[in-house]
Amino acid sequence: MLALLLLQAPCSTAEIQTLTITSDTRPMILIEKFGFTGRGHVSISVSSVSVVAGTGSQPEPSRLGFFLLSEESLLQVLIEMQQNPNFCVLDSHYTNHLFTFRCLSPPPASSFNHTYPLILPARYSLFFANCNPESSVSMKLHTEFFTLNRDGSRNYLPSGHALLPSLFFLFSILYFSFLAFWLYLCHVSNHSLLHRIHFLMPSLLLAKALSLLFAAAVKHHANLTGISHAWDDVTFLVFDFVSVVLLFTVVVLVGTRWTFLHPLRQRGKTVLFFVVLPLQILAHVAFVVVHNTGPYIQDWVTWNQILLLLDFISCCAVVFLFLWAIRLLRRITSKAQSEPAMNLDRFRLIKRFYLVVLGYFLMTRFGVFVLRTIIAYEYEWVSNLAEETVTLVFCIVMFYMFRLVEKDEYSVLAEIVVNE
Protein backbone atom coordinates (compact mmCIF):
# COMPACT_ATOMS: atom_id res chain seq x y z
CA MET A 1 0.00 0.00 0.00
CA LEU A 2 2.87 2.34 0.80
CA ALA A 3 4.50 1.77 -2.58
CA LEU A 4 1.18 2.21 -4.40
CA LEU A 5 0.57 5.57 -2.76
CA LEU A 6 4.05 6.84 -3.53
CA LEU A 7 3.92 5.73 -7.16
CA GLN A 8 0.51 7.25 -7.91
CA ALA A 9 0.69 10.45 -5.87
CA PRO A 10 1.86 13.47 -7.85
CA CYS A 11 3.21 16.58 -6.23
CA SER A 12 0.41 18.89 -5.20
CA THR A 13 -0.84 21.88 -7.16
CA ALA A 14 -1.20 23.93 -3.98
CA GLU A 15 1.59 23.54 -1.43
CA ILE A 16 -0.40 25.02 1.44
CA GLN A 17 -2.89 22.41 2.56
CA THR A 18 -5.56 22.69 5.23
CA LEU A 19 -7.51 19.53 5.82
CA THR A 20 -9.62 17.80 8.42
CA ILE A 21 -9.21 14.13 9.26
CA THR A 22 -12.23 12.58 10.95
CA SER A 23 -12.34 9.18 12.69
CA ASP A 24 -9.67 7.74 10.43
CA THR A 25 -8.47 4.24 11.29
CA ARG A 26 -5.84 3.85 8.58
CA PRO A 27 -2.41 2.84 9.92
CA MET A 28 -0.69 5.17 7.46
CA ILE A 29 -1.86 8.28 5.60
CA LEU A 30 0.12 9.93 2.83
CA ILE A 31 -0.41 13.66 3.33
CA GLU A 32 1.65 15.17 0.51
CA LYS A 33 4.77 14.94 -1.65
CA PHE A 34 7.27 17.67 -2.40
CA GLY A 35 10.65 17.81 -4.13
CA PHE A 36 13.45 20.05 -2.85
CA THR A 37 16.70 21.02 -4.53
CA GLY A 38 17.58 23.97 -2.31
CA ARG A 39 16.69 25.27 1.12
CA GLY A 40 13.55 23.28 1.75
CA HIS A 41 11.17 23.69 4.67
CA VAL A 42 8.12 21.83 5.94
CA SER A 43 5.72 23.58 8.30
CA ILE A 44 3.16 21.46 10.16
CA SER A 45 0.38 22.61 12.45
CA VAL A 46 -2.10 20.22 14.07
CA SER A 47 -4.99 21.10 16.36
CA SER A 48 -8.18 19.64 17.83
CA VAL A 49 -6.54 16.22 18.03
CA SER A 50 -8.55 13.36 19.46
CA VAL A 51 -7.78 9.65 19.52
CA VAL A 52 -10.51 7.12 20.20
CA ALA A 53 -9.42 3.69 21.38
CA GLY A 54 -10.83 0.55 19.87
CA THR A 55 -11.49 -2.68 21.71
CA GLY A 56 -7.92 -2.85 22.92
CA SER A 57 -5.91 -0.84 25.42
CA GLN A 58 -5.59 2.93 25.62
CA PRO A 59 -3.69 4.35 22.60
CA GLU A 60 -0.05 5.21 23.22
CA PRO A 61 0.71 8.82 22.05
CA SER A 62 4.25 7.88 21.04
CA ARG A 63 2.82 5.45 18.49
CA LEU A 64 1.08 8.21 16.55
CA GLY A 65 3.06 10.82 14.67
CA PHE A 66 4.37 12.37 11.48
CA PHE A 67 7.47 11.50 9.48
CA LEU A 68 9.12 12.24 6.15
CA LEU A 69 10.24 9.51 3.80
CA SER A 70 12.57 10.05 0.86
CA GLU A 71 12.34 7.96 -2.29
CA GLU A 72 15.81 6.58 -1.62
CA SER A 73 14.64 5.11 1.71
CA LEU A 74 11.38 3.67 0.42
CA LEU A 75 12.79 0.24 -0.42
CA GLN A 76 14.38 -0.20 3.01
CA VAL A 77 11.15 0.68 4.80
CA LEU A 78 9.19 -1.75 2.61
CA ILE A 79 11.64 -4.53 3.48
CA GLU A 80 11.22 -3.80 7.20
CA MET A 81 7.43 -3.91 6.91
CA GLN A 82 7.49 -7.18 4.94
CA GLN A 83 9.81 -8.88 7.41
CA ASN A 84 7.63 -7.92 10.37
CA PRO A 85 3.88 -7.40 9.74
CA ASN A 86 3.55 -5.76 13.19
CA PHE A 87 6.39 -3.35 12.53
CA CYS A 88 5.65 0.31 13.30
CA VAL A 89 7.13 2.59 10.68
CA LEU A 90 7.83 5.19 13.39
CA ASP A 91 10.54 2.83 14.68
CA SER A 92 12.36 2.76 11.36
CA HIS A 93 15.80 4.36 11.15
CA TYR A 94 15.23 5.17 7.49
CA THR A 95 12.48 7.71 8.13
CA ASN A 96 12.91 11.36 9.07
CA HIS A 97 10.95 11.67 12.31
CA LEU A 98 9.14 14.94 12.89
CA PHE A 99 7.02 14.56 16.01
CA THR A 100 4.62 12.24 17.81
CA PHE A 101 1.47 12.99 19.77
CA ARG A 102 3.60 13.15 22.92
CA CYS A 103 4.57 16.65 21.76
CA LEU A 104 0.97 17.89 21.72
CA SER A 105 -0.13 20.55 24.15
CA PRO A 106 -2.51 19.40 26.90
CA PRO A 107 -6.25 19.20 26.13
CA PRO A 108 -8.49 20.82 25.14
CA ALA A 109 -6.11 22.53 22.66
CA SER A 110 -4.14 19.35 21.80
CA SER A 111 -2.10 21.23 19.22
CA PHE A 112 1.43 21.44 17.84
CA ASN A 113 3.13 23.81 15.42
CA HIS A 114 6.67 23.66 14.06
CA THR A 115 8.73 24.33 10.91
CA TYR A 116 11.43 21.86 9.93
CA PRO A 117 14.37 22.70 7.65
CA LEU A 118 15.45 20.04 5.16
CA ILE A 119 19.13 20.02 4.34
CA LEU A 120 19.42 17.10 1.91
CA PRO A 121 17.82 17.70 -1.52
CA ALA A 122 15.32 14.95 -2.33
CA ARG A 123 11.67 14.29 -2.99
CA TYR A 124 9.98 13.70 0.34
CA SER A 125 6.62 12.25 1.26
CA LEU A 126 4.90 13.43 4.42
CA PHE A 127 3.14 10.61 6.27
CA PHE A 128 1.02 10.26 9.35
CA ALA A 129 1.36 6.89 11.09
CA ASN A 130 -1.02 5.30 13.58
CA CYS A 131 0.54 2.23 15.14
CA ASN A 132 -2.29 1.71 17.64
CA PRO A 133 -4.49 -0.99 16.10
CA GLU A 134 -8.23 -0.31 15.87
CA SER A 135 -7.89 3.27 17.12
CA SER A 136 -9.32 6.21 15.17
CA VAL A 137 -7.83 9.68 14.85
CA SER A 138 -9.48 13.06 14.27
CA MET A 139 -7.56 16.31 13.81
CA LYS A 140 -7.17 19.51 11.86
CA LEU A 141 -3.96 19.69 9.86
CA HIS A 142 -2.24 22.60 8.15
CA THR A 143 0.92 22.00 6.11
CA GLU A 144 3.21 24.24 4.08
CA PHE A 145 6.00 23.09 1.74
CA PHE A 146 8.34 25.71 0.37
CA THR A 147 11.91 26.61 -0.52
CA LEU A 148 13.58 29.89 0.36
CA ASN A 149 14.97 32.08 -2.39
CA ARG A 150 18.13 34.13 -1.92
CA ASP A 151 16.08 37.21 -1.03
CA GLY A 152 14.20 35.29 1.65
CA SER A 153 10.95 34.98 -0.30
CA ARG A 154 9.17 31.66 -0.50
CA ASN A 155 8.81 29.44 -3.54
CA TYR A 156 5.90 27.05 -3.09
CA LEU A 157 6.23 24.98 -6.24
CA PRO A 158 8.27 21.75 -6.11
CA SER A 159 11.59 21.96 -7.89
CA GLY A 160 10.29 19.78 -10.73
CA HIS A 161 7.37 22.15 -11.33
CA ALA A 162 9.24 25.45 -11.23
CA LEU A 163 9.25 25.80 -15.04
CA LEU A 164 5.63 24.76 -15.58
CA PRO A 165 4.11 28.29 -15.56
CA SER A 166 6.44 29.39 -18.36
CA LEU A 167 6.03 26.08 -20.19
CA PHE A 168 2.23 26.20 -20.19
CA PHE A 169 2.21 29.86 -21.20
CA LEU A 170 4.56 29.16 -24.12
CA PHE A 171 2.37 26.34 -25.44
CA SER A 172 -0.69 28.53 -25.00
CA ILE A 173 0.91 31.13 -27.29
CA LEU A 174 1.73 28.39 -29.81
CA TYR A 175 -1.88 27.19 -29.87
CA PHE A 176 -3.20 30.74 -30.25
CA SER A 177 -0.79 31.24 -33.17
CA PHE A 178 -1.88 27.94 -34.69
CA LEU A 179 -5.52 29.00 -34.32
CA ALA A 180 -4.88 32.35 -36.04
CA PHE A 181 -3.07 30.59 -38.91
CA TRP A 182 -5.91 28.09 -39.37
CA LEU A 183 -8.56 30.81 -39.37
CA TYR A 184 -6.51 32.70 -41.94
CA LEU A 185 -6.40 29.63 -44.18
CA CYS A 186 -10.16 29.20 -43.86
CA HIS A 187 -10.65 32.85 -44.77
CA VAL A 188 -8.45 32.89 -47.88
CA SER A 189 -9.43 29.42 -49.14
CA ASN A 190 -12.33 28.57 -51.38
CA HIS A 191 -15.36 28.48 -49.08
CA SER A 192 -16.82 25.59 -51.05
CA LEU A 193 -14.04 23.43 -49.60
CA LEU A 194 -15.15 24.10 -46.04
CA HIS A 195 -16.89 21.26 -44.25
CA ARG A 196 -18.50 21.14 -40.83
CA ILE A 197 -15.42 19.49 -39.37
CA HIS A 198 -13.29 22.48 -40.40
CA PHE A 199 -15.37 24.70 -38.11
CA LEU A 200 -15.09 22.27 -35.20
CA MET A 201 -11.31 21.89 -35.43
CA PRO A 202 -10.49 25.52 -34.47
CA SER A 203 -12.74 25.13 -31.41
CA LEU A 204 -10.33 22.45 -30.24
CA LEU A 205 -7.36 24.81 -30.65
CA LEU A 206 -9.13 27.60 -28.76
CA ALA A 207 -10.12 25.34 -25.85
CA LYS A 208 -6.61 23.89 -25.64
CA ALA A 209 -4.99 27.34 -25.72
CA LEU A 210 -7.27 28.65 -22.97
CA SER A 211 -6.77 25.57 -20.78
CA LEU A 212 -2.99 25.98 -21.00
CA LEU A 213 -3.25 29.71 -20.32
CA PHE A 214 -5.24 29.16 -17.13
CA ALA A 215 -3.01 26.23 -16.16
CA ALA A 216 -0.07 28.65 -16.30
CA ALA A 217 -2.02 31.13 -14.16
CA VAL A 218 -2.84 28.41 -11.60
CA LYS A 219 0.80 27.34 -11.32
CA HIS A 220 2.07 30.92 -11.16
CA HIS A 221 -0.34 31.85 -8.38
CA ALA A 222 0.47 28.65 -6.49
CA ASN A 223 4.18 29.42 -6.77
CA LEU A 224 3.74 32.86 -5.18
CA THR A 225 1.10 32.15 -2.55
CA GLY A 226 1.09 28.39 -2.04
CA ILE A 227 -2.56 28.07 -3.07
CA SER A 228 -4.27 28.11 -6.44
CA HIS A 229 -6.63 30.97 -7.22
CA ALA A 230 -10.21 29.65 -7.14
CA TRP A 231 -11.32 31.40 -10.36
CA ASP A 232 -8.25 30.30 -12.32
CA ASP A 233 -8.58 26.76 -11.01
CA VAL A 234 -12.25 26.43 -11.97
CA THR A 235 -11.67 28.02 -15.39
CA PHE A 236 -8.75 25.70 -16.05
CA LEU A 237 -10.83 22.63 -15.18
CA VAL A 238 -13.66 23.79 -17.45
CA PHE A 239 -11.49 24.47 -20.49
CA ASP A 240 -9.41 21.35 -19.88
CA PHE A 241 -12.60 19.30 -19.89
CA VAL A 242 -13.82 20.99 -23.08
CA SER A 243 -10.47 20.49 -24.82
CA VAL A 244 -10.35 16.78 -23.94
CA VAL A 245 -13.91 16.18 -25.13
CA LEU A 246 -13.30 18.16 -28.33
CA LEU A 247 -10.07 16.28 -28.99
CA PHE A 248 -11.80 12.91 -28.86
CA THR A 249 -14.74 14.27 -30.87
CA VAL A 250 -12.54 15.70 -33.62
CA VAL A 251 -10.38 12.57 -33.76
CA VAL A 252 -13.41 10.31 -34.12
CA LEU A 253 -15.20 12.53 -36.64
CA VAL A 254 -12.09 13.06 -38.73
CA GLY A 255 -10.99 9.45 -38.48
CA THR A 256 -14.33 8.06 -39.67
CA ARG A 257 -15.52 11.06 -41.69
CA TRP A 258 -18.84 10.73 -39.85
CA THR A 259 -19.54 7.48 -41.69
CA PHE A 260 -20.57 5.84 -38.43
CA LEU A 261 -23.51 8.28 -38.34
CA HIS A 262 -24.86 6.77 -41.56
CA PRO A 263 -28.56 6.18 -40.76
CA LEU A 264 -30.41 2.92 -40.10
CA ARG A 265 -27.86 0.40 -41.31
CA GLN A 266 -25.14 1.55 -38.93
CA ARG A 267 -27.36 2.48 -35.99
CA GLY A 268 -25.72 -0.11 -33.77
CA LYS A 269 -22.28 1.39 -34.36
CA THR A 270 -23.44 4.91 -33.50
CA VAL A 271 -23.90 3.82 -29.91
CA LEU A 272 -20.17 3.27 -29.60
CA PHE A 273 -19.40 6.91 -30.35
CA PHE A 274 -21.92 8.09 -27.80
CA VAL A 275 -20.19 5.87 -25.26
CA VAL A 276 -16.79 7.49 -25.81
CA LEU A 277 -17.86 10.97 -24.73
CA PRO A 278 -19.65 9.86 -21.52
CA LEU A 279 -16.55 7.86 -20.60
CA GLN A 280 -14.43 10.96 -21.03
CA ILE A 281 -16.89 12.96 -18.92
CA LEU A 282 -16.65 10.38 -16.13
CA ALA A 283 -12.87 10.33 -16.48
CA HIS A 284 -12.79 14.10 -16.09
CA VAL A 285 -14.93 13.88 -12.95
CA ALA A 286 -12.31 11.52 -11.55
CA PHE A 287 -9.61 13.97 -12.64
CA VAL A 288 -11.36 16.82 -10.78
CA VAL A 289 -11.49 14.71 -7.61
CA VAL A 290 -7.80 13.85 -7.89
CA HIS A 291 -6.86 17.45 -8.79
CA ASN A 292 -8.78 19.16 -5.99
CA THR A 293 -8.02 16.72 -3.20
CA GLY A 294 -4.91 14.79 -2.30
CA PRO A 295 -3.66 11.34 -1.37
CA TYR A 296 -4.94 11.80 2.18
CA ILE A 297 -8.56 10.99 1.24
CA GLN A 298 -9.44 7.34 1.67
CA ASP A 299 -10.57 6.66 -1.92
CA TRP A 300 -7.86 8.70 -3.60
CA VAL A 301 -6.07 5.68 -5.09
CA THR A 302 -9.41 4.30 -6.31
CA TRP A 303 -10.20 7.56 -8.11
CA ASN A 304 -6.78 7.42 -9.80
CA GLN A 305 -7.45 3.89 -10.97
CA ILE A 306 -10.90 4.88 -12.26
CA LEU A 307 -9.34 7.77 -14.16
CA LEU A 308 -6.76 5.53 -15.83
CA LEU A 309 -9.32 2.81 -16.61
CA LEU A 310 -11.89 5.14 -18.17
CA ASP A 311 -9.27 6.90 -20.26
CA PHE A 312 -7.91 3.56 -21.46
CA ILE A 313 -11.40 2.32 -22.40
CA SER A 314 -12.05 5.56 -24.30
CA CYS A 315 -8.85 5.16 -26.31
CA CYS A 316 -9.70 1.54 -27.10
CA ALA A 317 -13.18 2.60 -28.24
CA VAL A 318 -11.69 5.16 -30.63
CA VAL A 319 -9.30 2.56 -32.07
CA PHE A 320 -12.22 0.16 -32.52
CA LEU A 321 -14.16 2.86 -34.36
CA PHE A 322 -11.26 3.32 -36.76
CA LEU A 323 -10.99 -0.41 -37.44
CA TRP A 324 -14.72 -0.57 -38.06
CA ALA A 325 -14.57 2.45 -40.41
CA ILE A 326 -11.80 0.84 -42.47
CA ARG A 327 -13.79 -2.39 -42.75
CA LEU A 328 -16.91 -0.45 -43.76
CA LEU A 329 -15.08 1.53 -46.44
CA ARG A 330 -13.49 -1.64 -47.81
CA ARG A 331 -16.89 -3.25 -48.16
CA ILE A 332 -18.43 -0.19 -49.82
CA THR A 333 -15.60 0.48 -52.26
CA SER A 334 -15.49 -3.17 -53.29
CA LYS A 335 -18.85 -2.52 -54.96
CA ALA A 336 -17.32 0.15 -57.17
CA GLN A 337 -14.56 -1.86 -58.82
CA SER A 338 -15.51 -0.49 -62.25
CA GLU A 339 -13.76 2.76 -61.38
CA PRO A 340 -10.06 2.43 -60.55
CA ALA A 341 -10.21 5.57 -58.42
CA MET A 342 -12.52 3.75 -56.05
CA ASN A 343 -10.00 1.11 -55.09
CA LEU A 344 -9.45 1.27 -51.34
CA ASP A 345 -5.78 0.40 -51.74
CA ARG A 346 -5.27 3.84 -53.20
CA PHE A 347 -6.88 5.59 -50.25
CA ARG A 348 -4.07 5.53 -47.76
CA LEU A 349 -5.03 8.61 -45.75
CA ILE A 350 -7.32 6.92 -43.27
CA LYS A 351 -4.74 4.21 -42.63
CA ARG A 352 -2.04 6.79 -42.03
CA PHE A 353 -4.27 8.74 -39.70
CA TYR A 354 -5.09 5.56 -37.81
CA LEU A 355 -1.37 4.98 -37.22
CA VAL A 356 -0.92 8.62 -36.16
CA VAL A 357 -3.73 8.36 -33.61
CA LEU A 358 -2.45 5.03 -32.33
CA GLY A 359 1.03 6.51 -31.92
CA TYR A 360 -0.43 9.53 -30.13
CA PHE A 361 -2.32 7.36 -27.65
CA LEU A 362 0.72 5.19 -26.99
CA MET A 363 3.04 8.15 -26.43
CA THR A 364 0.69 10.24 -24.26
CA ARG A 365 -0.75 7.36 -22.21
CA PHE A 366 2.14 4.93 -21.86
CA GLY A 367 5.23 6.83 -22.95
CA VAL A 368 4.59 9.82 -20.69
CA PHE A 369 3.72 7.50 -17.78
CA VAL A 370 7.01 5.63 -18.17
CA LEU A 371 8.89 8.94 -18.44
CA ARG A 372 7.32 10.22 -15.22
CA THR A 373 8.26 6.99 -13.49
CA ILE A 374 11.94 6.92 -14.43
CA ILE A 375 12.80 10.63 -14.55
CA ALA A 376 14.41 12.40 -11.60
CA TYR A 377 12.05 14.54 -9.52
CA GLU A 378 13.80 17.81 -10.38
CA TYR A 379 13.08 17.15 -14.08
CA GLU A 380 9.38 16.32 -13.76
CA TRP A 381 8.60 19.23 -16.07
CA VAL A 382 10.19 17.27 -18.92
CA SER A 383 7.25 14.84 -18.89
CA ASN A 384 4.85 17.78 -19.27
CA LEU A 385 7.01 19.14 -22.08
CA ALA A 386 6.93 15.77 -23.83
CA GLU A 387 3.16 15.42 -23.45
CA GLU A 388 2.37 18.92 -24.70
CA THR A 389 4.84 18.60 -27.57
CA VAL A 390 3.34 15.30 -28.71
CA THR A 391 -0.18 16.76 -28.49
CA LEU A 392 0.77 19.86 -30.47
CA VAL A 393 2.55 17.82 -33.15
CA PHE A 394 -0.45 15.49 -33.34
CA CYS A 395 -2.81 18.44 -33.89
CA ILE A 396 -0.53 19.88 -36.56
CA VAL A 397 -0.35 16.55 -38.40
CA MET A 398 -4.11 16.00 -38.12
CA PHE A 399 -4.91 19.50 -39.38
CA TYR A 400 -2.43 19.11 -42.24
CA MET A 401 -3.82 15.74 -43.32
CA PHE A 402 -7.35 17.12 -43.45
CA ARG A 403 -6.66 20.63 -44.62
CA LEU A 404 -8.82 22.46 -47.13
CA VAL A 405 -7.99 20.84 -50.48
CA GLU A 406 -10.17 19.96 -53.41
CA LYS A 407 -11.11 16.30 -53.84
CA ASP A 408 -8.70 14.76 -51.41
CA GLU A 409 -8.78 11.02 -50.82
CA TYR A 410 -10.96 11.39 -47.77
CA SER A 411 -13.54 13.52 -49.54
CA VAL A 412 -13.89 10.85 -52.22
CA LEU A 413 -14.37 8.20 -49.58
CA ALA A 414 -17.00 10.32 -47.86
CA GLU A 415 -18.88 10.70 -51.16
CA ILE A 416 -18.82 6.95 -51.66
CA VAL A 417 -20.36 6.39 -48.23
CA VAL A 418 -23.02 9.04 -48.75
CA ASN A 419 -23.97 7.69 -52.19
CA GLU A 420 -24.06 4.20 -50.80
Question: What does each model-found stretch correspond to?
Answer:
Residues 70, 157-158, 195, 305, ...:
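Helix N-terminus capping/helix-initiation residues
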Residues 227-420:
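Generic detector of multi-pass transmembrane helix bundles and their immediately adjacent loops
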Residues 145-282:
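Hydrophobic alpha-helical transmembrane segments corresponding to the first two to three helices
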Residues 49, 131, 188, 260, ...:
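Residue-level marker of positions within ordered structural domains that often coincide
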Residues 11, 103, 131, 186, ...:
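Generic recognition of cysteine residues
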Residues 44, 124-126, 183, 255, ...:
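Structural signal for hydrophobic/aromatic residues that build the beta-strand cores
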Residues 1-162:
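Soluble extramembrane domains flanking the early transmembrane region of eukaryotic membrane proteins
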